[in-house]
Amino acid sequence: MTIKSDRWISRMAAEKGMIEPFQPGQVRADENGEKLISYGVSSYGYDVRCADEFKVFTNIHSATVDPKAFDERSFVDVKGEYCIIPPNSFALARTVEYFRIPRNVLTICLGKSTYARCGIIVNVTPLEPEWEGHVTLEFSNTTTLPAKIYAHEGVAQMLFFESDEVCETSYMDRGGKYQGQRGVTLPRA
């Protein structure tokens, strides 16, 4: 497997719609010159933005967390320019960008150091060959203080790895349960 460069990422976004909307360079400030957590294409990856839709975990119903029978009431919906995650809790969000992963590519997501250095961890499973959709992001606040996540700013970096051989069965071929997801998507058993 080979990691793909900014040139390849830009070409695939333009020719195949791999990332929409696509930012061809690194954005580090808004139109007023205010600093942002960067997003857009980088040397060997793409820094994604968080949309303004969040689901913050709460235990007001004293539910058991069960991935096979997840209680949707365990989340409080938040919409806004930022989200506050309670101490030792987590929130779900989604990327602004919609992805279409080629059949011979596997995409890995890593958190941005700006958040990691504040004790905020981003977790995303790999984007498999021929998966498409908005990426559901999980933010864990590992601190004992409330943590802030900013909408419309960079939150994680996608790395694209091209295989030397096309897979026999892609995510789309398997009829993956998260294929084509839009919005923040909760666990599906």
UniProtKB/Swiss-Prot annotation:
Record-listed E.C. numbers: 3.5.4.13
Transcription regulation among keywords: no
InterPro entries, alphabetized: dCTP_deaminase, dUTPase-like_sf, dUTPase_trimeric
MF (Gene Ontology): dCTP deaminase activity; nucleotide binding
Database matches in Pfam families: DCD
Positions bound to dCTP: 112-117, 136-138, 157, 171, 181
Reaction(s) this enzyme catalyzes, per UniProt: dCTP + H2O + H(+) = dUTP + NH4(+)
Function of the molecule: Catalyzes the deamination of dCTP to dUTP.
Binding partners and assembly: Homotrimer.
Name of the protein described by the UniProt record: dCTP deaminase
Organism the protein comes from: Alcanivorax borkumensis (strain ATCC 700651 / DSM 11573 / NCIMB 13689 / SK2)
